[in-house]
UniProtKB/Swiss-Prot annotation:
Cited Pfam families: Gemini_coat
Disordered, as annotated region: 1-35
Protein name: Capsid protein
GO molecular function, one term: structural molecule activity
Annotated Polar residues bias: 15-35
Role, per record: Encapsidates the viral DNA into characteristic twinned ('geminate') particles. Binds the genomic viral ssDNA and shuttles it into and out of the cell nucleus. The CP of bipartite geminiviruses is not required for cell-to-cell or systemic movement.
Top-level division of the source organism's lineage: Viruses
Amino acid sequence: MPKRDAPWRHMAGTSKVSRSGNYSPSGGMGSKSNKANAWVNRPMYRKPRIYRMYKSPDVPKGCEGPCKVQSYEQRHDISHVGKVMCISDITRGNGITHRVGKRFCVKSVYILGKIWMDENIMLKNHTNSVIFWLVRDRRPYGTPMDFGQVFNMFDNEPSTATVKNDLRDRYQVMHRFNAKVSGGQYASNEQALVRRFWKVNNHVVYNHQEAGKYENHTENALLLYMACTHASNPVYATLKIRIYFYDSITN
């Protein structure tokens, strides 16, 4: 004997909803995306042992949340003699862009922007490379040292720059990268995009002053050195540098 239909089946505008249906926004993409998502988001016990042994924590050791951020937006005139800027200048305060006490940890650095040439320089046939160095100053004092004071170069060429022997204990190059632009009448590449993201886990220590300045650092200041390889044609850099940091629990 067949079962009698439920009364709501004959009502207009109603339909039975299946419990086993997949009504997620990505459900129409097929089973391939579901399998891929399931594989990416698989539980930790299904991953290789190296993922379980060397998993880095979200919050650095000895620190507490929330994750704070500070941005440095500036247009730089990069020449052959080099330029330096401090990217760990954090003012003391209670905001999401301030440090609570003397100590904090810069977990990551994000550099975004472009390098470009002036219209007059763009018409000259030449190639110019801009080199960036992310340097940790372990014992900052006074004002940041110039590019030529920190790096030793052969024939004053920035592409051969290495930290001087007597400063290797104080200055440590954490990352280095370069970008290239070229000028000319026909095949010119007048600008180049810059995008870098690094995990540094750099523990910065300030003195009792509240202002975020290089002179108030006592340990591990982060410096960004910039220099171009062409001696007579400068390059401009429009950069937005973000650092993500956590306050120390010992403040």
